């Protein structure tokens, strides 16, 4: 279900939104998005077009279609990968603010970009908290990275969202996040995580590809060992079946020989067969046949 909110003075709306505290902005959007999968703001006074994966500001909203994006599933995956202490209060994602479509002179571009960066940093971390405008991050990798900054000082850096989006789109988010955090801890040992560049992302992708190759090699090795085991079991089963058949044949010939001897002896004696095949003799014959 998509909710439509009418805006009759876009400039005033943008000014009032930017004048809110960070907590006020986040609380407002979190409440709105908790009730709807997408938000549509229909602007009546000026021509605008601004879009994220979950929000649209447009003078003609009926002409714009949202792409499929399971927001609840993404929130669940993020919560499994990162412990964000304030997630119940701020159920928001970088995707809610990452602009896919923008227009020149947009008064909301800066605040949306800042919010996208804040939540990208949060979900790149092992754990994070957001309190009174202070963002605290803990990133556990080969080293441990502790980071703290004021949210109003966070600068624009598209690489943060790129890494976040790569982690949580396709593949195993847990494995990807662990590799990303290892690289971030190494690359940001003496530099600010906000200043990472394309080389950091390239290094993360390269290490992940090596990880996949190692996993494929281990899978092939395990498959080969399993095939050898199955082949060995089948071979031993066949040998056992042949051995069992040979024993059965041997015992069968012995029984036939015994019966022939008994019948022959009965011909030359006056003792009836009923007295020879007693219950005990029959039990012994059956035991010999099937041993």
Locate predicted features.
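Extended aliphatic helical segments
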Residues: 43-48, 64-65, 216, 233-234, ...
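Alpha-helical transmembrane segments of integral membrane proteins, especially early/N-terminal helices
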Residues: 158-176, 207-215, 244-256
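Short, non-transmembrane cytosolic segments of multipass membrane proteins
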Residues: 179-218
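Transmembrane alpha-helical segments and their cytosolic interface motifs
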Residues: 222-266
């Amino acid at each position: 279900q998509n909710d439509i909110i009418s805006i009759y003075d876009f400039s005033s709306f943008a000014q009032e939104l930017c004048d809110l505290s960070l907590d006020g902005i986040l609380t407002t959007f979190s409440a709105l998005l908790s009730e709807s999968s997408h938000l549509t703001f229909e602007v009546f006074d000026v021509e605008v077009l601004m879009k994220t994966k979950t929000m649209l500001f447009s003078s003609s909203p009926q002409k714009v279609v949202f792409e499929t994006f399971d927001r609840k599933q993404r929130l669940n995956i993020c919560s499994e990968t990162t412990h964000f202490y304030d997630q119940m209060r701020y159920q928001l994602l970088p995707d809610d603010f990452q602009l896919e479509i923008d227009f020149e002179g947009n008064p909301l571009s800066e605040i949306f970009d800042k919010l996208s960066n804040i939540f990208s940093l949060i979900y790149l971390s092992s754990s994070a908290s957001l309190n009174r405008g202070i963002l605290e991050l803990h990133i556990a990798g080969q080293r441990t990275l502790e980071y703290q900054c004021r949210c109003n000082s966070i600068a624009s850096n598209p690489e943060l969202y790129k890494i976040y989006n790569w982690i949580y789109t396709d593949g195993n988010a847990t494995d990807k996040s662990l590799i990303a955090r290892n690289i971030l801890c190494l690359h940001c040992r003496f530099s600010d995580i906000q200043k990472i560049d394309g080389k950091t992302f390239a290094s993360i992708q390269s290490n992940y590809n090596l990880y996949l190759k190692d996993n494929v090699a281990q899978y092939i090795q395990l498959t080969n060992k399993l095939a050898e085991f199955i082949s060995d079991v089948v071979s031993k089963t066949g040998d056992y079946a042949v051995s069992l058949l040979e024993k059965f044949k041997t015992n069968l010939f012995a029984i036939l020989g015994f019966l022939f001897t008994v019948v022959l002896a009965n011909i030359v004696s006056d003792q009836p067969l009923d007295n020879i095949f007693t219950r005990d003799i029959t039990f012994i014959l059956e035991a010999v046949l099937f041993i």
